[in-house]
């Protein structure tokens, strides 16, 4: 009898040890533990930590918790800016059999799409789904197991913003990461609109964080104005960019508020938190069967013209009417 009791105790201890070894970072549902309340497991793959993507993830979680209180466990993973890590993360989600994957930024989305054709995938902070997923004549709906939200602001309006704020500008430097397909798309479109206005555009494309500062310096030496699209690598290195452009007195127009803040003059801003919330609302509909993801169109959010008051003051630029100051 003593031997049986001892064996039972050892088995229990081993079971507890194995459970502890298998833990991952999770956000438990409000109002209970994962074992008690969770109905769904959602894997979140975020490319890199920076303000915009962080806000989108936060909005996603908040909206889904509000829609399905006490029913969702979130597994949050950050790829630390490495697309290869995105593949590792989403393959882990697939092996675990999560109920839905939220892919925050384009490399996370493409990794998820490559990993599964069965688990629903919702993207957020994706600039152009057609470009990211190599879809010809993209009509607004991806189909299959993929949908989501886009952070794309009107690119013609961005080009017009450059000429409205800086009507004397002749040379525009386009600073972006060549490894980000969405950045290439934005740069090509903005170049098309600016060239039609007689403005000379020159690309300054960095491949990774190592050459951001040197390319920013080259852009500053060429340009009257620098344009930076919605670009994750640029957003993660905006301090290095600001340390070059601001002392040189070169104004920058940004594709999104995160890059503009403390670095640029003006932007067409969207709320990444609201973008994430919209994605979370879509997720609730997919998880409960209220909506078929294969027919869900990509959703967008309205942009607000904003300016950075500190940068404008530093560069001696008077803000245009109709622009709201960025709150810090």
Which residues does each PLM region occupy?
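Sec-dependent N-terminal signal peptides of Gram-positive bacterial secreted proteins and lipoproteins
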Residues: 4-23
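Bacterial lipoprotein signal-peptidase II cleavage site
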Residues: 19-33
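Extracytoplasmic "Venus flytrap"
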Residues: 37-61, 67-69, 75-85, 183, ...
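An alpha-beta-alpha
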Residues: 42, 60, 147-194, 295-312
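Beta-alpha junction/loop-to-helix N-cap segments that form part of ligand/metal-binding clefts
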Residues: 76-137, 231-246, 250-255
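Hydrophobic alpha-helical segments within soluble ligand-binding/sensing domains
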Residues: 129-171, 270-291
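Pocket-lining segment of extracytoplasmic ligand-binding domains
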Residues: 181-250, 256
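Hinge/cleft segment of the Venus flytrap/periplasmic-binding protein
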Residues: 285-328
């Amino acid at each position: 009898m003593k031997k049986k009791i001892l064996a039972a105790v050892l088995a229990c201890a081993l079971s507890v040890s194995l459970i502890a070894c298998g833990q991952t970072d999770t956000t438990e549902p409000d109002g209970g533990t994962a074992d008690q309340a969770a109905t769904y497991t959602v894997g979140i793959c975020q490319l890199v930590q920076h303000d915009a993507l962080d806000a989108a993830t936060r909005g996603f979680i908040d909206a889904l918790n509000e829609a399905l209180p006490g029913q969702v466990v979130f597994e949050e993973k950050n790829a630390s800016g490495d697309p290869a890590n995105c593949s590792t993360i989403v393959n882990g989600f697939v092996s675990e059999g999560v109920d839905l994957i939220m892919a925050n930024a384009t490399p996370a989305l493409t990794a998820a799409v490559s990993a599964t054709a069965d688990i629903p995938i919702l993207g957020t902070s994706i600039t152009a789904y057609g470009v990211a997923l190599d879809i010809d004549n993209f009509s607004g709906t991806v189909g299959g197991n993929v949908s989501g939200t886009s952070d794309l602001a009107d690119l013609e309006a961005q080009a017009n913003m450059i000429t409205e704020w800086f009507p004397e500008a002749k040379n525009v430097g386009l600073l972006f990461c060549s490894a980000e397909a969405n950045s290439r798309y934005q740069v090509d479109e903005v170049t098309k609109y600016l060239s039609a206005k007689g403005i000379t555009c020159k690309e300054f494309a960095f491949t990774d964080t190592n050459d951001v500062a040197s390319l920013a310096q080259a852009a500053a030496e060429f340009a009257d104005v620098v344009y930076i699209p919605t670009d994750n690598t640029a957003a993660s290195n905006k301090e290095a960019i600001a340390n070059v452009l601001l002392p040189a007195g070169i104004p920058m127009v940004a594709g999104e508020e995160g890059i503009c803040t403390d670095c640029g003059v003006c932007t067409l801003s969207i709320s990444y938190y609201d973008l994430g919330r919209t994605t979370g609302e879509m997720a609730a509909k997919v998880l409960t069967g209220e909506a078929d993801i294969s027919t869900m169109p990509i959703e967008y959010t309205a942009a607000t013209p904003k300016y950075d008051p500190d940068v404008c003051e530093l560069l001696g630029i008077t803000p245009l009417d109709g622009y709201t100051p960025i709150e810090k």
